[in-house]
Amino acid sequence: MLRPVHCVVPFKSSGCKTRLSSALSGEQRWQLAVAMLRDVLRTLRSIGMVTVLARPGMREDIIADLDATLRFSELELGDALNGFIDENTAAGWPADILIVMADLPLIREEDVLEMIRTPGGVVLAPGRGGGTNMILIRDSRFRTRYKGLSFAKHKREAEELGIEAGYCYSYRAGCDIDEPGDLIEILLHTNGESRALLERFGLRILESDGRGRLDQTQSNE
């Protein structure tokens, strides 16, 4: 029988996705960040409890229809997440903690279930470039190290604590949206709010030399 899972999604509500600035305006990047968050929450709502960790000032109505709790924290990402783990530990560990990044609009329920079914005191799903896109924590000793090449740091954290680590290698879970070229993946592989938004912005895929490239002829939205 699968243990209860509490999903935690950290969300940066200001100055988000600056590496997309060559393709999207500041307002468009904000709208996309919200759309991706909502796509992630829609995937997670069938898994268990869901909490969004955000800085104070984020509007609660953005996620009000998605059965998620909004929790504010002034702390940096790693400290906010580790504080959440501390509280879960103090409460007797009522549920395992699944940390999911908010820029994974490609993930589906089966990707999350694969994480939950993978054995280990901690289960890591790497992102491209050395990041960690999802972490399932079953052992209350584990704490996150979300800076720089976090995947290697999380592996080392588990090793140093003597925690058995499991790994979940998924294309969709590994596809975080950071660069303009990543937007193609949304248009190709999703049918959620993120794709609808990019199409409304006028973005589309053109074929060039047998490969897809992003047409940045955009609307003024």
From Swiss-Prot:
It catalyses: (2S)-2-phospholactate + GTP + H(+) = (2S)-lactyl-2-diphospho-5'-guanosine + diphosphate. Coiled coil: none annotated. One of its GO terms (molecular function) is GTP binding. Its EC number is 2.7.7.68. The keyword Endoplasmic reticulum does not apply. It holds the Pfam family CofC. Keywords: GTP-binding, Nucleotide-binding, Nucleotidyltransferase, Transferase. The keyword Acetylation does not apply. Gene3D superfamilies: 6.10.140.50, Spore Coat Polysaccharide Biosynthesis Protein SpsA, Chain A (3.90.550.10). Pathway: Cofactor biosynthesis; coenzyme F420 biosynthesis. GO terms for biological process: F420-0 metabolic process. Signal peptide: none annotated. Belongs to the CofC family. Guanylyltransferase that catalyzes the activation of (2S)-2-phospholactate (2-PL) as (2S)-lactyl-2-diphospho-5'-guanosine, via the condensation of 2-PL with GTP. It is involved in the biosynthesis of coenzyme F420, a hydride carrier cofactor. This is 2-phospho-L-lactate guanylyltransferase. It comes from Methanothrix thermoacetophila (strain DSM 6194 / JCM 14653 / NBRC 101360 / PT). The gene is cofC.
